[in-house]
């Protein structure tokens, strides 16, 4: 199962994590050493991007402190998912949050799990989104369009 989240929201979340770990690594050498030792190199001063096909070219000249960097990363990651989606169950993050009970039922069915007695418990884990939309003006609109098209393709192929 692969959750697919709105690309700008997802990229903004990744950027927040990167900035969070930049601050933690600068403040506490133990955190940086610990994250290195356990192989968490996704964010902060230790950041090493996963080598998705075409990512190096996409990230050339991009700053990891920018939303565009993480949008490029999102596109490369989910292009890889799209190319290998056979056997994957794609699930819209937003649909899980807005209609947890229905989506939980569909997910359990897709996973061939008899969860009829636990459906309410399972669906309770998916909290509705706050009604407020966030604005992210600091990104390339054409990059957003590319990411949105991929997002729609993936969500359409999902449950």
Regions found by a protein language model. Name each.
Residues 1-17:
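Conserved phosphate-donor/acceptor-positioning beta-strand/loop module used by diverse small-molecule
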Residues 19, 23-159:
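PAPS-dependent sulfotransferases, especially Golgi type II membrane carbohydrate sulfotransferases
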């Amino acid at each position: 199962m692969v959750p697919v989240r709105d690309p700008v929201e997802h990229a903004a979340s990744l950027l927040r994590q990167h900035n969070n770990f930049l601050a933690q690594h600068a403040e506490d050498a133990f955190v940086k050493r610990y994250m290195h030792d356990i192989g968490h190199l996704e964010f902060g001063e230790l950041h090493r991007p996963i080598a998705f096909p075409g990512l190096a070219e996409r990230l050339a000249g991009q700053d990891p402190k920018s939303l565009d960097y993480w949008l490029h990363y999102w596109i490369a990651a989910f292009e890889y998912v799209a190319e290998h989606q056979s056997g994957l169950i794609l699930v819209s993050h937003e649909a899980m949050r807005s209609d947890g009970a229905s989506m939980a039922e569909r997910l359990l069915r897709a996973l061939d799990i008899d969860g009829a007695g636990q459906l309410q418990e399972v669906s309770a884990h998916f909290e509705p989104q706050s009604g407020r939309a966030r604005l992210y003006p600091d990104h390339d609109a054409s990059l957003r369009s590319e990411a949105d098209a991929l997002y729609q393709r993936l969500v359409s192929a999902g449950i």
